[in-house]
Structures are given as C-alpha cells and as structure tokens.
C-alpha cells in the first residue's frame, strides 16, 4: 500500500488508504506500506494527534489504525526525501514522528518503491 496523497488536501483518501492497509493486515495478508510525497505527514505525531482531536474521525480510530500498521505490517517505509521536504530528518525524527518509529520504519526512496512494486502481487495507491 502506498500512501502519497497530502492529508491536508484529501484527508479522506489518506484515511481510507490507512484503513485498507490495516484491514488487509488484520485479514492475514503480508502488507508493506510505503509513505511518500506528502503522505509522510501521516507518520507525524503532531499531525496524527491533531487529526484525532479534530472530531473528523471517531476518537482513537486513527491511533488504532496506525498501531496496526506500525506493529503488524510486514514492513513500513518512508521516503527520506519526502520527509526532509516536510522538515523531518533522521536527526530530528525522534521529536516529530510517531513513537517507536526507529523500531518499525525504514528510511528509503525510489529504489525501495521500485523493489516493493516489482515484488508485489497487488498494489493499492492512495
């Protein structure tokens, strides 16, 4: 599952992508999730906290979805360049990303996207 849409432009699309990834994981599929472009905002702790507080989703729902992905996906990748464009680097990630990111997230870029795409049977892009 690739999450590339800016949640500030089309939040519903991002949430649907995250929900589909979480459901596929719960259904027993091997799921790799790659956050790129402005979709990397979905890994930003402040953004997720704000989204939960906004009332646009049931309270705690986004935390549950992201917990499923971060704890049970086969792998979670983020675009290093996209994160940098949003002010997140490896040096300041601990202050900005979801807790425990260094345990479940792999910094990557186009080679990772290509490899995952070439090795996947199904791709969902949001």
List the model feature ranges, each with a label.
Residues 1-15, 47:
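Short, glycine-rich nucleotide/cofactor-binding loops
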Residues 39-52:
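N-terminal beta-loop-helix "entrance" segment that forms/cooperates
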């Amino acid at each position: 599952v690739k999450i590339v849409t800016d949640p500030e432009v089309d939040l519903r699309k991002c949430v649907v992508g995250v929900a589909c990834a979480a459901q596929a994981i719960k259904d027993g599929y091997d799921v790799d999730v790659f956050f790129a472009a402005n979709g990397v905002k979905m890994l930003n702790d402040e953004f997720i906290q704000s989204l939960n507080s906004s009332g646009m989703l049931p309270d705690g729902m986004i935390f549950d979805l992201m917990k499923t992905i971060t704890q049970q996906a086969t792998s979670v990748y983020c675009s290093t360049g996209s994160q940098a464009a949003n002010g997140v680097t490896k040096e300041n990630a601990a202050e900005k990303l979801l807790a425990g990111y260094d345990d479940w997230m792999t910094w990557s870029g186009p080679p990772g996207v290509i490899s995952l795409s070439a090795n996947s049977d199904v791709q969902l892009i949001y």
